[in-house]
Amino acid sequence: MIHLGVTQMNLLYSHQKLNNRWIILFIMIMALWLGMSSFSTAESPTDAIIKEQAEHLNTEPVEQYWDKLMKDYGGYFPESKTPTFMELLLGTKGISMKSIFKGLLRYVFHEIIINGKLLASIVILTIFSMILETLQSSFERNTVSKLGYSITYMVLIIIAINSFSVAIGYAKTAITSMIEFMIAIMPLLLTLLASMGNVTSVAILHPLIVFMIHSVGTAIYVFVFPLLFFSAVLHIVSSLSDKYKVTQLANLLRTISLSMLGVFVTVFLGVISIQGTAGAVRDGVAIRTAKYITGNFVPVVGRLFSDATETVIGASLLVKNAIGLVGVVILIMLCAFPAIKILTLAFIYNLSAAVMQPLGDSPIIACLQTIGKSLIYVFAALAAVSLMFFLALTIMITISNVSVMMR
């Protein structure tokens, strides 16, 4: 009897233990299901950190450039394709390269239509000057025709020089906007770099980039554009007379200006890339050492602190890359629209020279061709400067990626 009672008690205890296991298993399954459902409906911790960092950053200095671009040129893009700055930054609403190209193409046609008046004026004045030039050889008393030809020729020269000055003004305005934009976006990128532990890179790049941007911009204003302007003027003066030519001096000034531009771009990119990469390597080694020491020698919370720091650094990296990519888009658009204006003017003058050439060989045609070629050089200078800032911004984006790879 005693043995039977013990056996029943054991069976009852086993049954109760089995029920408890089933209850525990049911609770674990319910907890796992609830956790999965909440995970599917809520955002991940990394996304929350990214959104929080983006909202706490002072993006107003950069955002005003995007707002100004949309105010000035947003009409060339479909309204549904122009997101706000924060939508572009967080990726909730983007802008495709297709819509950008469509907007730029619309702007090209708009500029061609606007400059059609300039084309018509140049063609009419050129035809009128050729008629007066023909009258000079048809009559013995050609004083009036010579005077009319000279006045017409001077009017064309004034129009050409004025167009060239306007093009240089477009280029200077674009370069000034890009310099100010680079100065505005640097604190954002450097702050995120510092939050990722890239203290050495920030200490090196902050004064270096500010100094190089201002130095290169000032040098282009003081040397490159004035030399291109004087080169164009000397070419025009050389077309006035067959006896007195200064084309060699004009070509020399043009060569010097383009050579100086190449030197500025090379020095700027070389210094920033070398110093930035060296700083990124040092930061990567330092952060990796600190992470190893924290994770292995700090008891209990060391590994947890190391993983949390890694999550924050990864979120900062994503935010920095997003800001960098938005900055690249803004930088391209700051350069693209003035560059289109300059290219349109160059196209107008080259087209005028091509249309007028079958009517006869005239100094005016050579003058128009010279202005068109000089405008192409102004565009090349603007494109080189924008490429320099574009690569500098890309280097800034890549620096933290190098330090993360080192970790």
What are these model-predicted stretches?
Residues 146-157, 178-186, 215-221, 252-266, ...:
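Small-residue-enriched core segments of transmembrane alpha-helices in multipass membrane transport
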Residues 2-28, 32-125, 130-149, 163-173, ...:
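Gly/Ser-rich, low-complexity
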Residues 181-185, 192, 354-358, 362:
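Extended, low-complexity, charged alpha-helical tracts
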Residues 341-349, 353-357, 361, 376, ...:
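Membrane-helix cytosolic exit motif
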Residues 321-362, 370:
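Helical hairpin unit composed of two closely spaced alpha helices linked by a short loop
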Residues 150-163, 182-199, 219-231, 236:
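Mid-bilayer segments of alpha-helical transmembrane spans in multi-pass integral membrane proteins
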